Amino acid sequence: NYKDRYMLTGTFRADGSSRFTNDKWGYFPSIAAAWTVTNEKFMKNQKLFSEIKIRASYGLIGNQDITPYSTLGLMGSTSFNYGTDTNYTGYWASGLATPDLTWEKVKQLDLGIDLGFFDNRLTVSLDYYDKKTSDALLQQTAANYLGGTKYWVNAGEVSNKGLDISISGRILQNKE
């Protein structure tokens, strides 16, 4: 924060997860900046706005919400006796190996402006967002001849874009 006009923040995360076999680490940076225009000298004599703040942020986050050990190839067993006193053990693939499964990644850009009127008794916020999910974690089912088991894959991308508008008013306000 510089002179209550310019704000800048950033983070960097390195997250490790034992839920993934080969690609355990995900790296997730983010940055945000804001400019309070009404705190500039050239805005001091205007009376219309009590606040103008322009905001922008960009970040990357990860998702590792899968069942532990689900990237390993696992075997299941059961016993059959075929109508006799002797039990025979049968095996099947109860979990297919997916060693290259990796973090689901979400990239998001936000651009916004906050406007205040009448000593901030009326405020308006406009926000544009663009959110893209890649390497989405999806559980699929193997064919029956492979055991019919479920396994995780990185499949697909999702994109969301939109505009959020918020209007707030403080009709009654005590002077404190």
Give residue ranges: language-model regions:
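Extracellular/periplasmic, surface-exposed regions of secreted and cell-surface proteins
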Residues: 1-176
